[in-house]
Amino acid sequence: MSDNQREAGTIILDPTHASFAPEETVHDLGATHFIGIGGAGMSVLAEMLHEQGVEVDGSDREPSAKTDRLQSLGITVEFGQQAKNVEGKNTVVFSSAIKPDNPEIVAAHEAGERIVHRSDILALLMNAKRAVTVAGAHGKTTTSSMLAHILVNAGEGELADPSYAIGGSIQGKDGAILDGGHAGKGNVLVAEADESDGSFAKYHPQIAIITNSEADHLDHYGTQDNYRAAFVDHAGHATKAVIMCGDDEGNLAVLRALDATVAGRTIVYSTRNAAELGDLNGATLVRIESESETAESGAEHFTLHIPGGLIGEEERRIAVTLTVPGIHNARNASAAIIAAALLGMDVERASAAVTSFLGAARRFQVRGTVSQVTVVDDYAHHPTEIAALLDAARRRYPQSKIRVIFQPHLFSRTRFFSSEFAQALAKADDVIVTGIFPAREKQEDFPDVTPATIVDEALKLEHEPAKDWIRGVEDMHTAAQMMVMRAHHGDVIFTVGAGDITQMDEVILHALEAHRWDCEG
């Protein structure tokens, strides 16, 4: 058992503690058990270890699509977490959602089994590959999915058949949903680097992409300064290059805090020019130039201006077309294309490959259309993500009324960002805020936080119409039915949030079918 998990006889679970010696590999793990194996970040790692021949099993509270997939691969999954599940295991893996009093943690502790955080497993996998990490408050899954897509579809030689560990699923070329984990035979690993618990401090990638460092997860970091300091530290661990978005003020603060050596190998991508950005601390600028004000055709067009000396002696202008709309996706694609070029892929080949990217699951995912009312699902759960989503919606559907059912994620986040959520949601025409998805929190600890926390802030804003554009409805099934009754021909309904609001898509589509003639009125 790791030293950080023994303290005066108690069990300490510290996600920031590194549990493995530098020379250890995944083949030193022995029989490995994942607690909460159906979680997005856990199932990916379990599958990757399984593909590499490690004996893997796990447990979870209930069946899910993730556990179904793992079982189809031959991985044993027990439902219900109990001591017997870890008998005879060498390594037990936990995530930050697991508490020290979990019966499997207690049993593993008593048996002297090695207990490690999921980030320790990912760090082991990285050490054997040319790793590219993607960190940031928003855009991690989409950016890492784009890079994996480029490598899968255009990689040759050592860049072919990459490994990837992505928290969400990916839409393949044919629209099929692919799992976010794969242990490839190539020498590249693309991984999301989750900053929420500080565990990304363990990673030492060749290339570190930082999409943004807007304050989030202050329940862990305490202050914005501490949060950004973690990104400064993470950037310093990249051995070859750092790729950062310059459109985020938090990132610019991180950039200016880097030491000269790290800043000198940093590439900034931005829709702004050098004069607008100001001091870049010696970093190289790649500028993004958008080609149009809308993406009504369904495509996003932009040009990358790559200075000479970065990937060749001559300055390059690379035209890029995306299937997924939004300036935020142009930024995400720029990071992925630059990373692919730094890995050794021809930049034109990389930009051509990203054109066929259909999106990560639950990122502007069109779920269906009935009576010309389109239903779109998105994972956005932070005000900046919601604002970017609704900006993209306006570009993609400039003539449509945009209706949103938003399920807040975490009581603490809802309270802290209530005003910012209201301002972001004001970009829509019609909004219903549902009950809050608690995740790891408990309602009794936040008795004053309800849908009205956001609605009350929103009603202070100037908005047309002034009174009835937003309302709170605790039950999401009721919210879905209400939104269907309000919808008309040509509208777009978005289900938004990181919780189980995605389940309402089918409910909405079936209700639209039942009210087909009303929608056409």
From Swiss-Prot:
GO molecular function, one term: UDP-N-acetylmuramate-L-alanine ligase activity
Reaction catalysed by this enzyme: UDP-N-acetyl-alpha-D-muramate + L-alanine + ATP = UDP-N-acetyl-alpha-D-muramoyl-L-alanine + ADP + phosphate + H(+)
Binding site for ATP: 136-142
The organism's taxonomic lineage, starting at the top: Bacteria, Bacillati, Actinomycetota, Actinomycetes, Bifidobacteriales
Entry keyword set: ATP-binding, Cell cycle, Cell division, Cell shape, Cell wall biogenesis/degradation, Cytoplasm, Ligase, Nucleotide-binding, Peptidoglycan synthesis
Signal sequence residues: none
Keyword Nucleotide-binding in annotation: yes
Family: Belongs to the MurCDEF family.
Protein name: UDP-N-acetylmuramate--L-alanine ligase
Pathway where it operates: Cell wall biogenesis; peptidoglycan biosynthesis
EC numbers, comma separated: 6.3.2.8
Compartments where found: Cytoplasm
GO cellular component: cytoplasm
PANTHER family per UniProt: UDP-N-ACETYLMURAMATE--L-ALANINE LIGASE, UDP-N-ACETYLMURAMATE--L-ALANINE LIGASE-RELATED
Main function: Cell wall formation.
GO biological process: cell division; cell wall organization; peptidoglycan biosynthetic process; regulation of cell shape
